[in-house]
């Protein structure tokens, strides 16, 4: 059964560097713990994995922020660690401790055993993508996603989140051959995973390189960027409805390497809050009618802990920092998708998110009419 036509394509237009009536926005982790309705769904599901592996719950939770806020895109509710879980590493979430993998990949034997998994093990994700597309009924586009090869490797070597990345960096420097083997398998797995999401109905896909910024210059290019490029080279260009599927790459802490990332085969580069939007636009945003990258970001998520009046001020600063919006509908030009610089804090009052969304839409409309 074909999916409903899209009523709001502002996000996809901005990804393609096409003019929009306002700056579109969505928020990293927009479906999450800051929403009381998410907490209720999670309680019913019994656990995070109970939510993520249930088509019905994943659909319900993905749509929750859209019921509250007029966001311009939905993002699949899932977790980047479903991929190593499918590789047989055993994902679990202990209360208050974050994700853990039961098995780690740190030596020749465990690296030799690593292989691209059968995507049937992730069928629950692809079924959720199709279910969410149907439930959205054309309201806004659906973004699929994966962790980057490097970010997944961090968890696969460390076994959990890390403060210093001692184990994964130690392996990278002492046995780069093993690290490259892990990353090559991860890249081919991520590509297959994202292609299956596209086949299921994802209208854009995003690679989260959440830990790329912990790498040294040189190491970033060799161990993160090269393998993100390997993923992008394998991705399908069109979705189930025949439209192109924009590709987004977000590297937390990646501002120093924007010029390197300009060569990536993607339409959009995500920025964290340490990046200067004006500088990024000048470096990679391109000119009207010419090639370039759309930019996504990059307000500090903790701005949302401030009173609404302060949030409005900060929103305006971000929009002003990007500079004059592209308005010529006859050609492409520099475009901006508003987002946070990383995931939303669980302590964020939902009313503050409403203030941010309203401020982005109203101020960016005024910019175009001014």
From Swiss-Prot:
Coiled coil (UniProt feature): none
Pathway note: Porphyrin-containing compound metabolism; protoporphyrin-IX biosynthesis; coproporphyrinogen-III from 5-aminolevulinate: step 4/4
Binding site for substrate: 29-33, 79, 155, 210, 342
Compartments reported by the entry: Cytoplasm
Biological process terms in GO annotation: protoporphyrinogen IX biosynthetic process from glutamate
Source superkingdom: Bacteria
Record-linked Gene3D superfamilies: 3.20.20.210
Keywords: Cytoplasm, Decarboxylase, Lyase, Porphyrin biosynthesis
Gene Ontology terms, MF aspect: uroporphyrinogen decarboxylase activity
Predominant place of localization: cytoplasm
UniProt site (Transition state stabilizer): 79
EC number(s) per entry: 4.1.1.37
Catalytic EC class: lyase
Reaction catalyzed: uroporphyrinogen III + 4 H(+) = coproporphyrinogen III + 4 CO2
Protease among keywords: no
Cellular-component GO terms for this entry: cytosol
Disulphide linkage map: none
HAMAP family documented for this protein: URO_D (MF_00218)
Job description of the protein: Catalyzes the decarboxylation of four acetate groups of uroporphyrinogen-III to yield coproporphyrinogen-III.
PANTHER family found in the cross-reference section: METHYLTETRAHYDROFOLATE:HOMOCYSTEINE METHYLTRANSFERASE RELATED, UROPORPHYRINOGEN DECARBOXYLASE
Family from the record: Belongs to the uroporphyrinogen decarboxylase family.
Protein name: Uroporphyrinogen decarboxylase
Taxonomic source organism: Verminephrobacter eiseniae (strain EF01-2)
Source lineage: Bacteria, Pseudomonadati, Pseudomonadota, Betaproteobacteria, Burkholderiales
């Amino acid at each position: 059964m074909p999916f409903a036509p899209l009523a709001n394509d502002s996000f996809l237009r901005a990804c393609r560097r096409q003019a929009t009536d306002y700056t579109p926005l969505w928020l990293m982790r927009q479906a999450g713990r800051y929403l009381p309705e998410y907490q209720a769904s999670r309680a019913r599901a019994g656990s995070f994995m109970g939510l993520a592996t249930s088509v019905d719950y994943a659909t319900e939770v993905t749509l929750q922020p859209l019921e509250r806020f007029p966001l311009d895109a939905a993002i699949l509710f899932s977790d980047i660690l479903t991929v190593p879980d499918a590789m047989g590493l055993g994902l679990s979430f202990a209360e208050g401790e974050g994700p853990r993998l039961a098995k780690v990949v740190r030596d020749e034997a465990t690296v030799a055993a690593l292989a691209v998994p059968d995507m049937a093990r992730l069928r629950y994700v692809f079924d959720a993508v199709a279910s969410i597309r149907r439930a959205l009924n054309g309201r806004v586009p659906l973004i699929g996603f994966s962790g980057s090869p490097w970010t997944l490797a961090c968890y696969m070597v460390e076994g959990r989140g890390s403060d210093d990345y001692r184990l994964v960096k130690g392996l990278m420097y002492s046995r780069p051959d093993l690290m490259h083997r892990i990353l090559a398998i991860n890249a081919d797995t991520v590509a297959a995973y994202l292609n299956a999401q596209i086949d299921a109905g994802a209208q854009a896909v995003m690679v989260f390189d959440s830990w790329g910024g912990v790498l040294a210059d040189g190491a970033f290019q060799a161990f993160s960027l090269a393998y993100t490029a390997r993923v992008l080279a394998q991705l399908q260009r069109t979705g189930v409805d025949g439209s192109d599927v924009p590709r987004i790459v977000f590297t937390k802490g990646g501002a120093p390497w924007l010029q390197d990332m300009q060569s990536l085969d993607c339409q959009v580069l995500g920025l964290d809050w340490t990046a200067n939007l004006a500088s990024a636009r000048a470096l990679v945003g391109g000119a009207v009618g010419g090639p370039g990258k759309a930019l996504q970001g990059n307000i500090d998520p903790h701005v949302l802990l401030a009173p609404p009046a302060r949030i409005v001020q900060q929103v305006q600063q971000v929009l002003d920092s990007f500079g004059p919006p592209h308005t010529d509908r006859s050609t492409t030009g520099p475009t901006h998708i508003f987002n946070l610089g990383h995931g939303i804090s669980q302590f964020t009052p939902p009313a503050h998110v409403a203030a941010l969304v309203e401020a982005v839409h109203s101020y960016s409309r005024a910019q175009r009419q001014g």
